[in-house]
């Protein structure tokens, strides 16, 4: 018998708490949720602004960890940047407005490859996390970026020019009613990156509240990272 996948649904995965060690000697708390079956690819999630409640458990990232390992074979790596608290605990250090978070992002990427032994890694940033991705997720082993509600608040022109020259794929999901950067403006401000795909999401807002928005985001991630599992089902049966 199948059950409808709801906001509270937690599907099977191998879940483990992790500690990420930064170059400036901080310990960051996190979690890896891995498929019980074959791992197709992995995503590293960079959360929204912690001074406005952003953390590794921000709802889109939490639901990605609850669903994508089972439904799409996608391993989900989440962590709290310095000074950020969630149910998993508090990462050491103090919020640094996206400056020393460079060390957090670089350490998380290295953890993914050295400890989690990922083979295909995409970076998924949401809001503040999109600026971190554009500025610091430059490791050549990364396959591409997926940006959710990018505000382009701290990304500099040279960051965009780096990605333009680099050529790796970038997808930006921009809500129709985003409070910080709407689709038309996003097209202009991202124009320096010729390969970027900007997807205007009708009816959505910056925080992606509601199951239709969640489903759309997770589907778009799946299409890029594990396309054979697209589209995601809306129901799940324990006997698959």
Labelled PLM ranges:
Residues 125-133:
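Gly/Ala-rich beta-loop-alpha elbow adjacent to hydrolase catalytic centers
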Residues 153-154, 176-181, 206-207:
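Acidic catalytic loop of the alpha/beta-hydrolase fold
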């Amino acid at each position: 018998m199948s059950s409808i996948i709801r906001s509270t649904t937690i599907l099977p995965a191998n879940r483990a708490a992790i500690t990420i060690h930064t170059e400036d000697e901080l310990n960051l708390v996190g979690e890896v949720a891995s498929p019980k079956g074959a791992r197709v690819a992995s995503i590293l999630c960079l959360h929204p602004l912690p001074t406005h409640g952003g953390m590794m458990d921000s709802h889109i990232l939490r639901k990605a960890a609850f669903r994508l390992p089972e439904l799409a074979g996608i391993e989900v790596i989440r962590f709290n940047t310095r000074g950020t608290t969630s149910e998993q605990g508090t990462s050491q250090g103090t919020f640094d407005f996206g400056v020393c978070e460079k060390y957090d992002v670089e350490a998380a990427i290295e953890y993914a490859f050295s400890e989690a032994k990922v083979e295909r890694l995409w970076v998924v940033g949401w809001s503040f996390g999109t600026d971190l991705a554009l500025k610091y997720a430059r490791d050549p082993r990364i396959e591409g970026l997926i940006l959710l509600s990018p505000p382009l608040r701290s990304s500099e022109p040279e960051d965009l020019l780096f990605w333009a020259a680099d050529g790796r794929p970038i997808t930006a999901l921009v809500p129709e009613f985003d409070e910080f950067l709407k689709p038309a403006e996003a097209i202009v401000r991202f124009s320096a990156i010729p390969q970027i795909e900007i997807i205007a999401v009708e009816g959505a807002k910056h925080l992606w509240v509601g199951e239709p928005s969640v489903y759309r985001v997770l589907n778009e991630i799946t299409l890029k990272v594990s396309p054979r599992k697209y589209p995601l089902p809306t129901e799940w049966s324990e006997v698959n």
